[in-house]
């Protein structure tokens, strides 16, 4: 981001898009905690990441934390994986309207694992996607040899 005010404006527009979406991108509780919990946690996660690098958010849903990481950290190349068409379309539309540089993959992680994305990410994250014993095999194929998985509950 070029400056803090631009980031704040983009975050506000992103939050408004989440709140106004007809697609139930977040649960009622998630919407209630969006600005008090989910956005701050995503920003904190973004700040903790080394850079430059590549980040993959598996099961992006409404874009937490991946979309917020892309907003906060333009030095990172962020990819979002979302299997549900309406959610992937939302992420594409919001990225275009806000000018945020992300790549949205409308697919299941298991399907993409055999693609040219395998072994190319420094960080793979997933928030409330599945238990760790199921999640790790979905995420591991995307990691570089020194990459890490960040599973967020």
Residue ranges and their predicted role:
Residues 43, 67, 133:
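Conserved active-site region of classical short-chain dehydrogenase/reductase
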Residues 59:
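Conserved glycine-centered beta->alpha loop in an early N-terminal alpha/beta scaffold
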Residues 73-79, 83-153:
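S-adenosylmethionine
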Residues 62-75:
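Conserved SAM-binding loop of SAM-dependent methyltransferases across substrates and taxa
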Residues 20-23, 69, 117, 142:
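A generic structural signal for ordered alpha-helices
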């Amino acid at each position: 981001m070029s400056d803090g005010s631009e980031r704040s404006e983009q975050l506000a527009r992103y939050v408004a898009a989440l709140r106004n979406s007809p697609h139930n991108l977040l649960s009622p509780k998630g919407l209630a905690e969006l600005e008090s919990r989910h956005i701050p946690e995503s920003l904190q996660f973004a700040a903790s990441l080394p850079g430059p690098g590549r980040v993959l958010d598996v099961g992006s849903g409404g874009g937490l934390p991946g979309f917020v990481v892309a907003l906060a950290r333009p030095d990172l190349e962020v990819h979002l994986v979302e299997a549900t068409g309406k959610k992937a379309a939302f992420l594409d539309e919001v990225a275009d309207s806000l000018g945020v540089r992300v790549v949205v993959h409308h697919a299941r992680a298991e399907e993409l694992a055999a693609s040219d994305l395998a072994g190319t990410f420094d960080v793979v994250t997933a928030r409330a996607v599945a238990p760790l014993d199921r999640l790790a095999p979905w995420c591991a194929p995307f990691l570089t040899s020194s990459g890490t998985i960040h599973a967020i509950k």
